[in-house]
Amino acid sequence: MNNLFICYTPFHLNMAFSIIKKMKYKSNILVYLPSIGNKKNKYYYKQSKKYYKITYSKIIKLSYIKDFIYIHNLAKQIKDVNIFCAGNLKTMYSRLLLSLIKHNRLCTFDDGVGHYYKSPYFANTKEKIIGRIFLRKNFYYSSLLSKVKLHFTLYPNKNIKHKTIKLDYNSVCDS
């Protein structure tokens, strides 16, 4: 069965590849959803494609309606995976895909930067109106946190409550 990696930035692409190497995951699918189309995003996506069985990419946030349709169509193609691994579980795109794709295990990964801010983006679990409209309550960010089975991070200190695997910064940057 396939493993699915949802990435939003070039750094996410590198982290996902580091996870694949460290865990020796086989048969992986990449969904890359950058918010802008530039040379850097295209370059890293092109470099990453060779490590995945199937890849998908779309620039998001240009039209939420088109994005919503794209995510639904994408979920119909992927259907089910063993591991669902998201670089940012809080975004609507990750949670919408998660609600539509059958999976056995939920994993997350981050660079740890959010832990250095006084009021981090990820600490706010209040659901935005768009999430309340499009997602069932069990796919609200606050509900999903307890379902994460494994979390990969660069952050050296206590992170989240789930089983955490620390990635070495150099292994990510050398990907």
Model regions and ranges:
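Loop-centered beta-sheet repeat module
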Residues: 142-175
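Active-site and donor-binding regions of nucleotide-sugar-utilizing enzymes
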Residues: 4-155
